[in-house]
Amino acid sequence: MLRVVVGGVFVAHGLQKLRGYWDGPGLEGTEKMMESLEMHPAPLQARAVALAETVGGGALALGIATPYAAAALIATMVTAVRKVHLNNGFFNSKRGYEYNAVLATAVLAVVADGPGVISVDAVGGNHRAGIGSALFALVAGIAGSFFATGVASSLKPTAPAEDA
């Protein structure tokens, strides 16, 4: 049940960013947000986060490639904490990282416990679970976050050179 609920939350947030559903910003607004966070190129970063949340959330909800879906979702949460929420403290009421931490922890709990018997992974005989799978998702997610922000800083647009 946790897998379906948490995956559904990510799908909803991804669709807000991707399509503008439920008063979300859509891709244009997400691109502007990425630009303001100096996540370059903003169009690529916007699509990456929107798809990671939508596809990763759907995969988590269905129990498809669960540790890999979890890694993508953890990457989005780690990046959100690092780029937006960390300096605001813990509580969500002050735009802190509370919500992101809860979602990332729930994702890790799903991976540690396994996708469950009613999942695509279980039907396919790929029922990975345990601390090793959770550790993989956590490390891969953190690495993904640092990769995305490293790419963002290396691809920062520069002003065109002026003619002398």
Put a short name on every predicted segment.
Residues 51-60, 84-85:
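Hydrophobic, membrane-inserted alpha-helices
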Residues 43, 56-57, 103-105:
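Short hydrophobic "helix-edge" motifs at membrane interfaces and signal-peptide entry regions
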Residues 60-66:
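Transmembrane alpha-helical segments of multipass membrane enzymes and assembly factors
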Residues 10, 47-50, 54, 64, ...:
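Hydrophobic transmembrane-helix microenvironments that flank and shape a buried ionizable site
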Residues 37-44, 64, 90, 94:
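Juxtamembrane loop-transmembrane helix junctions in multi-pass integral membrane proteins
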Residues 9, 13-49:
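Solvent-exposed, well-ordered loop and adjacent helix/strand elements within mature globular domains
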Residues 32, 49, 63, 73-76:
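Internal, well-ordered alpha-helical scaffold/interface segments
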Residues 1-17, 66-164:
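Extended, low-polarity transmembrane helix blocks
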